[in-house]
């Protein structure tokens, strides 16, 4: 199965669909993102924008989810920033806290005090 993310004009993922692998094959039988995009447009309209994503492989850093941002410069889907103090890891395109989370129990992030608090 192949997964494609619909991207709106603000580069936000609005939905993710699953199509058959055969719907992504070019005339030579090779997988082609362009063929998959054309198939999605045939289903949802020619004015829609699609980018392939993968649940099993991180071809675009992260699997696309509704609300994620598509960044073509990074060739990545970026999840929403969970807190203003968290920064983007450029390698993984995941958000990281200002201080690493403790590993000795259950904690939650306290944004007002920018620290981890034990549950």
Q: Language-model features: where?
A:
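Interaction-interface detector
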Residues: 1-119
């Amino acid at each position: 199965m192949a997964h494609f993310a619909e991207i709106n004009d603000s580069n936000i993922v609005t939905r993710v669909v699953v199509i058959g692998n055969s719907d992504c094959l070019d005339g030579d039988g090779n997988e082609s993102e362009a063929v998959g995009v054309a198939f999605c447009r045939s289903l949802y309209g020619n004015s829609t924008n699609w980018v392939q994503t993968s649940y099993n492989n991180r071809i675009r850093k992260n699997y696309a989810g509704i609300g994620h941002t598509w960044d073509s410069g990074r060739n990545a889907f970026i999840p929403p920033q969970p807190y203003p103090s968290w920064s983007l890891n450029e390698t993984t395109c995941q958000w990281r806290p200002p201080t690493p989370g403790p590993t000795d129990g259950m904690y939650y992030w306290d944004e007002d005090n920018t620290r981890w608090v034990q549950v």
